[in-house]
Amino acid sequence: MAQLRMFQVDAFTKTRFAGNPAAVVLLDTWLPDAVLTAIAAENNLAETAFLVATAQDGYELRWFTPTSEVPLCGHATLASALVLADEIGLSPPFRFHTRKSGTLQVDRSETGYSMRLPRRTVVPGGDPAEIAAVLGIPVLETRFVPVDGDDMVLAVVADEGALMAMRPDI
C-alpha cells in the first residue's frame, strides 16, 4: 500500500483545535478521482486539499469534500501554503494552479498569510425575498456570481447589525 504525506491544519487561528480545519495531502502524481474522494471521506473534514508539484513554478491544487470535488476552497489553500512553508521548508510566495479557479497565489508576511483570489463576474440575479426567507433577515438586493460548478448568490443587507441578526433556515 502506498504511503501518503498528509497534514491537518486549523486555518484562521493560532489556537489548537480552533479555526477551520482542512487536510492537506502531498502527492507525486494524481490518483483517480474516486480515490481522492475516498481519502477526503475518511478525513471527514469540510475539505481536503491535494497537491502535486509542477515542473514549472508551483503546484497543481484540487479540493475534495467527503462526497465530491469543489472548484475553490480558501481555507484549504491557505492550509496548503502553511504545510509547504512550515512542514516542507519551502519559501512563499506559492502559486497554485487549479482546474476551475485559475492560478491562486499565497504569500506570507509578519502578520500572517494572504491569498490573491480570482476576480469574478457579478451579474444581477437571485430572488431577494427567497434569500431573505432562508437567511431570516431583510435582504435589500441580490447578485449572482457564476462559477463553474459552484454558482453563488450574494445578498446585500442594510448593515452589520442585520448581518449579525441572521438566523439561517437551512
Which residue stretches match the model-derived regions?
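Active-site proximal loop and beta-alpha junction motif in alpha/beta enzyme cores
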Residues: 1-73, 78-170
